[in-house]
Amino acid sequence: MKDRTQELRTAKDSDDDDDVAVTVDRDRFMDEFFEQVEEIRGFIDKIAENVEEVKRKHSAILASPNPDEKTKEELEELMSDIKKTANKVRSKLKSIEQSIEQEEGLNRSSADLRIRKTQHSTLSRKFVEVMSEYNATQSDYRERCKGRIQRQLEITGRTTTSEELEDMLESGNPAIFASGIIMDSSISKQALSEIETRHSEIIKLENSIRELHDMFMDMAMLVESQGEMIDRIEYNVEHAVDYVERAVSDTKKAVKYQSKARRKKIMIIICCVILGIVIASTVGGIFA
């Protein structure tokens, strides 16, 4: 009969090597994934910083009837940078999402997959929060520009309702603001100049909002769909923590009871020994 011991040993070593290779590959994959997570988080933080800077530029522009071109250019650069960075974040989150869906399609389930899903959901929510803040900042700036236009129209003697002003803005025609205004004073000319400036700012703003709208809605819908999953994960984590705390408490009680039982056992043994000595002494005395 042929001895297959060496063959089986070689096959086992080969299987062990394969297991090690798979583990190393998986660890390397997760390391690369966490590097990607940190990169995305850095991009989101950068957007948040730029949004705060945009707010400061808005205030500076509104504080001046005729803001300098440098400030306006810096604002446009910030908005352009936010758009580019947001598109990068969206693309990377989409890539992670597709990778997760592929593994789910193969019915794979692992701790690594759950970690990736949780990280993806967390980043998506943070991204939408930052972009929501940016959207709110833009909307607030539009309202403030609109208020300045309305006040300047009043200076020229032209009163408009909010609805009428909105219609004028939507027309996209700056000449509509000059109709009915008598340009017979420097005040009227200055007021019209600021109106045109604010109208130009609103047009740029609306273009920016329009460009980001589809991306924002896409990510918002993704986060909403993930809401239930996140809630389930948080529920399971909370209950797992409760379970662990109860287990620790029960273990402490068990140790305490075990310690008491051990002490009782020792005391009983000591009593038995003493009793044995007494009995032995008594019996010895009787026979003596």
Swiss-Prot record:
Coiled coil: 68-109
UniProt subcellular location: Cytoplasmic vesicle, Secretory vesicle, Synaptic vesicle membrane; Synapse, Synaptosome; Cell membrane
Changes after translation: Phosphorylated by CK2. Phosphorylation at Ser-188 by DAPK1 significantly decreases its interaction with STXBP1.
Covalent cross-link site, Glycyl lysine isopeptide (Lys-Gly) (interchain with G-Cter in SUMO): K252, K253, K256
SUPFAM superfamilies (alphabetical): t-snare proteins
Bilayer topology: Single-pass type IV membrane protein
Residues annotated with Phosphoserine modification: S14, S64, S95, S188
Effect of K256R: Complete loss of sumoylation
Membrane topology (Extracellular): 287-288
Molecular function terms from GO: ATP-dependent protein binding; calcium channel inhibitor activity; calcium-dependent protein binding; chloride channel inhibitor activity; identical protein binding; kinase binding; myosin head/neck binding; protein-containing complex binding
PANTHER family (alphabetical): SYNTAXIN, SYNTAXIN-1A
Function: Plays an essential role in hormone and neurotransmitter calcium-dependent exocytosis and endocytosis. Part of the SNARE (Soluble NSF Attachment Receptor) complex composed of SNAP25, STX1A and VAMP2 which mediates the fusion of synaptic vesicles with the presynaptic plasma membrane. STX1A and SNAP25 are localized on the plasma membrane while VAMP2 resides in synaptic vesicles. The pairing of the three SNAREs from the N-terminal SNARE motifs to the C-terminal anchors leads to the formation of the SNARE complex, which brings membranes into close proximity and results in final fusion.
Family to which this protein belongs: Belongs to the syntaxin family.
Record-given protein name: Syntaxin-1A
